[in-house]
Amino acid sequence: MITALCLSFVFQGLTPEQIKAENLPEPYPPKTGLVDTRRVDRHTVCLHFRDGYVLYHHAGQKRSDDTVVLKSPLDVAAATAPMAFSVTSIVRSGALKETTVVATRKSKGTAFAWYADKWIDNHAVNDRPDSAQEHWIYLHCNLGLQDGAAYHIVSPSLHLDTSVVFDAAGSLSDSVHVNLLGYRPDSPAKFGYLYAWEGDGGCLDVKPYVGQPFHVIEAQSGVNAFTGAVQFRAGKSNPETAVAGDTPGSNFLSADVADCDFSSLAEPGRYYLSIPGVGRSRVFEIRADIYRAAFRSVMMGVLGNRSGIDLAPPHVPYHRPAPHNTALTPGFAAKLKYTTSRYIDRTNFDSSLADKPAVEAGIKGDLSVAGWYQDAGDWDSYESHIQVPETLMLAYMLAPANFSSGELNLPDAPTGLPDILTEARWLPAFCYRLRHELLSRNYGTGGIGLRICGDYFGDDTGPNGIARGSWQDTDRIWTASGEDPVSTYGYAAVAANLALCYRQAGKRDPSVDWAREAEESYDWAAKNTKAGDENKPDFKEYQMYALCCLHLLTGDQRFATELLAETADYSPSTRLWWSQLDGPAVYLMAQSKFKDPVLVGRFRSAVLGTADAEMESAHRRALRWGGDWGMPMLVGQQTTPWVAAIAVASQVTKTSDPTASRRYFGAVETTADYFLGTNPLNQTWVSGLGPEFPRDPFHMDSWYEEGVYPRPGIVPYGPWRKEHDQGSGPWDQDWANKSVYPPIDQWPGAERWFNNRCSPLNGEFTISQNLAPSALVYGFLCGGSQTAGSR
């Protein structure tokens, strides 16, 4: 490896104004026509075109009032015709050199309107444009594109005439990928990458760069802070998933990848990665708390999904009036009912009209409780939301020094608790109020049900199809589901976990005895489990989670006895996916004098086995992101850092095996890198974060409220596996397939993001699947207020 720190050679420095400008997000409506011209490599330049955009409907309009504005549609046939372009270089001597050009392209829709003019063969057919495309035209030149030379690019058929100067230090290149935020100084794994998929032109040939130097440049001074050698990482045929058919050749990039390792560069500062003959990355930072912006952004996303309260500046940069609160929401009085119908008995856990008779028959009367979490872009509550406080509390237990009181600017009255625990308290506090209202009204006997929705009595848009926010949803009945053991075990678990966190933080809750709540709820769930309930989703996981927390909290041997029986078959081959990790992770990380050494050993082996499996994925994938190798490309597989087990493993081994701990920590970091910029789209997967991010997530309140759009802190589902050749309408994740070139089956999975806000499975999210796991990883990495947690 070639290394050189603080060399005297000076590249091009950037002014503070330039650095700020290139890290600002693009305004809306966006620029159309030729958006930018960037070099891909020594022989290829990319022209990026945008046809137009969508003017979206507003509150009080119908969704079909969207309007597609095509200001500068590209003639793609003309753009790829032989001799469509000429590229002439102006060398230093002043002489002109014309190069032979071959044009290739990729195109996709990146803005979609929500309408269906006609319905033919079970598909929407529109008589007007229903999307706006973006195009990337790759001009392959037989003569090399030299650093420092000026190039004149002309296409008479496109009425295009532009000039550009390329150089490795000053010219941005989308082929150079970095974490757009940056890296910790003590990171054991700082990597940038060189790769590109060029549509029908194949992929960038990285082999000529292997062994050649790269440079990490101090952004303002232009001083070369580090030089290393480009190394080949993996080929385009390298498998990156066990799931066949999700992406061509089981590779999410369809590109050869080379990497640039600058792990030993630890000096804080602002830098860019420069590769001669290609160009440079955007400016990034090396800073101890570099992940804090990502953590705070995602936590604002969690806050934004609180129901029942008014959200407004200075806590959030928008105004959403209080929804679904019988006391605060005008017109919602007497609209929330309790039904004895358990959601776990229904034919569909979302909603089905087949279940409506049972829901109606079970209604016992009104409820006044408010303040659950909205699930996603819609407004319902699910038992899976138990994962939100669990995940936030686990993040705190993993790295308590990383979190403080006041940093998230929450609307809650200050208590001295770290803000992450204040947010974690939100749902248990709602469960407490729900449980005690059910008892006081004689509706219930001590349990709760967490499926709360209005789906059985109307749609989100109302009877007239008029767009509205959650605070305007007042013309239908909402129901809270009947007491069930799954929801109640979940509540018992987070109540006990919260008590443990209060104890660890040296605080107490003056208004709720969480230990008592946990034990009473656990006992109710155990006594009210019906035949078959134990086979419902999350039943065993929440029961295990509750047992773990209650044993740590109380030391009661009955909980340990149950745990020992339930974990008798645990081994290093046990895999703890999703909510299966909850109890074991908390058992290992919580501070408690009651830990059973046998249980610690069992949980440790299972967690480390799971972490090793997640980390093996990072080793095998070119861009080093971890997770479940067998997870299909859906619900956030390409957007969300699901590596909690690796984070736990890093802490569990910190004293016993520091080398292993550092490896685990590095895998969490490189996973975060992927979701914060090293991905093929060169964007973060958090709305509002960084210069490039998801612009149009499916989130109805943000479409209609006043303030910043899109809402900050949303991590969408993102790229989704193809399920049909043709989507049925704009709400279908396959609707965008018709907008792409080459055909969708040739598109690498990681580039199948179309910014289709009409499609829940592409643009939506859930707080439990996407936001909370992201908050855990970025919070774990963000470093303490005094760089605590430094490794």
What do the PLM-derived regions correspond to, one by one?
Residues 567-574:
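Solenoid-like repeat scaffolds
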Residues 481-482, 530-535:
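Flexible helix-coil transition and linker loops at the boundaries of alpha-helical arrays
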Residues 17, 21, 166-190, 280-325:
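Low-complexity, Pro/Ser/Thr- and charge-rich linker/hinge segments at domain boundaries
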Residues 129-168, 270-279, 783-785:
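Ser/Thr/Pro-rich, low-complexity mucin-like regions
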Residues 1-8:
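Sec-dependent signal peptide recognition
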Residues 409-420:
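Acidic, glycine-anchored loop motifs typical of Ca2+
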Residues 418-447:
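Carboxylate/His-rich catalytic cores and anion/metal-binding grooves
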Residues 29-39, 43-133, 137, 181-182, ...:
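Aromatic (Trp/Tyr) and acidic
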